[in-house]
């Protein structure tokens, strides 16, 4: 069985791991609740036998597991109805849920309840996860060069936690690996689809001008230097910056 590793520098996560580790020798019921794609299931997999995982959407399997096993891990726990009828006695039960209702029943059923914080509250985890996904996706895409995509912290998509972070890194790696021919092909496809009207040149030339100037300003930190690099007058550059609403 493949070893599952959970990457985190978060004190909150380390405390959850500590609590779960201490419970390995105890017959107790534990609930881990948090937003989707925060790593709840991966965290539990890194500590417990994956063969004990039961989908809460399958009520028959849940009942069967609770009747026959001493250790049961139930994911999609929020899908279970009539939680109060579940028998957790003399068992180690770990439930994983995206949300919970009936808090008074939950409080009675579980000895320990851990809240998994979303990634936006675990910024200290981002460098680890970004490096991990860069290496993983580079292998997946068979990118041989040691490419380091430009990551802007303020632009990282955490709306769906780890899922959207990975998608963001995937996109950045693809963009970082594009050749001149690739870029020309992308522009060709876009322009073929969208070219219309009677002022198309002026409307579409910013597809080239805006990223050119934005990248230059970020790289050279100076309008004067950039105007020299581009071979245009500084006033012309300033005018373009205003026209293109570049901050």
Residue positions per predicted region:
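Dynamic helix-loop-helix/coil hinge segments at AAA+ ATPase domain boundaries and subdomain interfaces
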Residues: 1-21, 27, 156, 194-205
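Structural recognition of the conserved hydrophobic beta-strand(s) that form the central parallel beta-sheet
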Residues: 72-76, 91-99
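Conserved P-loop NTPase "ATPase switch" module shared by AAA+ and STAND
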Residues: 34, 54-85
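Nucleotide-binding/hydrolysis machinery
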Residues: 2-11, 89-90, 99-189
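Walker A/P-loop
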Residues: 21, 25-63
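Conserved RecA-like P-loop NTPase ATPase core
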Residues: 16, 32, 38, 75, ...
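Bacterial C-terminal helix-turn-helix
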Residues: 36-40, 195-247
